[in-house]
């Protein structure tokens, strides 16, 4: 093998795998062994040729001089033939060497081709992996940048402030009043409205006394549902002539109600003090509804011992006298006393719990009024009689 071939093989070894390198070395070793064998055969063939030429010369000396010329010619012919034979022998050896080198070259070319194919396949396999890795690395950046672009477009365009407000659960408060109380502006972004929805619900509860609960929920894409729960009306306050609703938390709503809008049966409070109204509502919260629904009017009737004494007139004409601060304790006992009452009675719960007939009280009141009238009539003539005497005394003086 020439130096050029060796240089080419060295360059190719860089691209071959470990197994291919070993196989290539094995082939080179084989080719070297074959070359050494051919060299030995050539060396062995040279002494044989010299021995044959010496034998022919000895036989030629024993013959006649005449035959020397012919033998010399024959020897010359033999030498030419031997040279030709040696050349013929060398030619197949060279052919064998060339064939072995050709085979090795073919094999190396095959291995080189296989190596190139393997390298190409590996390159093809590696290329998509590298591309995927770069894609995976760039994916977060692409996602974040695209989201930022979409958000900027959303806030710049009027789509960012579109809102559809839906109010449910309202009976006494209009939809416009509720939306106004939330303080949601039409220019507010949909996103900020979603983030501050709890604050808007608190604004609604603070601004409107009717609202007990408020909840704002979001429905994609632009709908906000305002669910409200209103306080129930417990009674009506009518101490000033106008009738105002009293809701279940004890607040007197400063919106007069027309008599035509009043229900058939309702609790009428004749209490001008709003603090006492709130206290009454708190006390009645522990009283059963069966008793509360039977109360027709509530009047403040203080006594010398109890300043917050109330008189509750029931729908069946019974009356209950009870202190405001003891309603939650004593008024529930009315359900036990009520079955024992056969006629309109007064149930006194100021000091204890006892009842007496209302007719007797009315009779006593009537008797007291008559006595007052009689006493007033008796005192009037005395005064008239005393008047002239006073006049005479003055004249005498």
Curated annotation (Swiss-Prot):
Upper classification of the organism: Bacteria, Bacillati, Bacillota, Bacilli, Lactobacillales
Spans through the membrane: 139-159
Cellular component, GO, one term: plasma membrane
UniProt cross-references to InterPro entries, sorted A to Z: DivIB, FtsQ_DivIB, POTRA, POTRA_FtsQ_type
Function: Cell division protein that may be involved in stabilizing or promoting the assembly of the division complex.
Compartment(s) where it occurs, according to its Swiss-Prot or TrEMBL record: Cell membrane
Ranges of biased composition (kind: Acidic residues): 74-103, 366-377
Ranges facing Extracellular side: 160-397
Region named Disordered: 24-115, 360-397
Family: Belongs to the FtsQ/DivIB family. DivIB subfamily.
Stated name of the protein: Cell division protein DivIB
PROSITE patterns: POTRA
Segments on the Cytoplasmic side according to the record's topology features: 1-138
Primary subcellular site in the record, as a coarse category: membrane
Key words, A-Z: Cell cycle, Cell division, Cell membrane, Membrane, Transmembrane, Transmembrane helix
Domain POTRA: 160-231
Any one Gene Ontology BP term: FtsZ-dependent cytokinesis
Topology relative to the membrane: Single-pass type II membrane protein
């Amino acid at each position: 093998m020439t130096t050029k071939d060796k240089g080419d093989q060295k360059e190719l070894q860089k691209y071959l795998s470990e197994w291919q390198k070993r196989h290539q070395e094995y082939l080179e070793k084989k080719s070297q062994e074959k070359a050494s064998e051919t060299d030995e055969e050539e060396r062995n063939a040279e002494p044989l040729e010299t021995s044959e030429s010496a034998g022919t010369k000895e036989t030629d000396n024993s013959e006649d001089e005449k035959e020397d010329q012919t033998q010399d010619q024959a020897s010359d012919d033999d030498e030419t033939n031997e040279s030709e034979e040696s050349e013929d022998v060398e030619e197949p050896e060279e052919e064998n060497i060339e064939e072995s080198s050709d085979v090795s070259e073919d094999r190396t070319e095959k291995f080189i081709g296989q190596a190139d194919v393997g390298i190409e396949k590996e390159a093809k396999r590696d290329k998509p992996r590298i591309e995927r890795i770069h894609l995976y690395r760039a994916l977060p950046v692409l996602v974040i940048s695209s989201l930022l672009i979409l958000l900027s477009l959303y806030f710049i365009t009027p789509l960012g402030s579109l809102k559809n407000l839906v109010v449910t659960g309202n009976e006494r408060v209009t939809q416009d009043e509720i939306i106004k109380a939330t303080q949601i502006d039409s220019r507010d972004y949909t996103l900020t409205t979603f983030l501050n929805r709890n604050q808007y619900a608190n604004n609604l509860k603070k601004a409107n006394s009717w609202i007990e609960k408020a909840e704002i929920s979001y429905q994609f894409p632009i709908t906000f549902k305002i669910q409200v729960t209103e306080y129930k009306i417990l009674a009506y306050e009518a101490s000033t002539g106008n009738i105002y609703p009293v809701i279940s938390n004890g607040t007197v709503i400063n919106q007069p109600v027309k008599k035509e809008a009043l229900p058939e049966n309702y609790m009428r409070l004749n209490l001008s003090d709003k603090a006492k109204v709130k206290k009454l509502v708190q006390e009645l919260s522990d009283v059963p509804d069966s008793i509360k629904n039977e109360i027709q009017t509530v009047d403040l009737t203080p006594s010398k011992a109890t300043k917050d004494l109330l008189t509750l007139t029931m729908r069946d004409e019974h009356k209950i006298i009870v202190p405001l601060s003891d309603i939650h304790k004593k008024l529930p006992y009315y359900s036990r006393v009520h079955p024992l009452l056969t006629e309109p009675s007064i149930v006194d719960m100021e000091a204890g719990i006892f009842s007496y007939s209302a007719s007797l009280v009315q009779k006593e009141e009537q008797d007291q009024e008559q006595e007052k009238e009689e006493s007033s009539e008796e005192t009037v003539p005395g005064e008239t009689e005393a008047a002239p005497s006073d006049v005479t005394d003055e004249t005498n003086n």
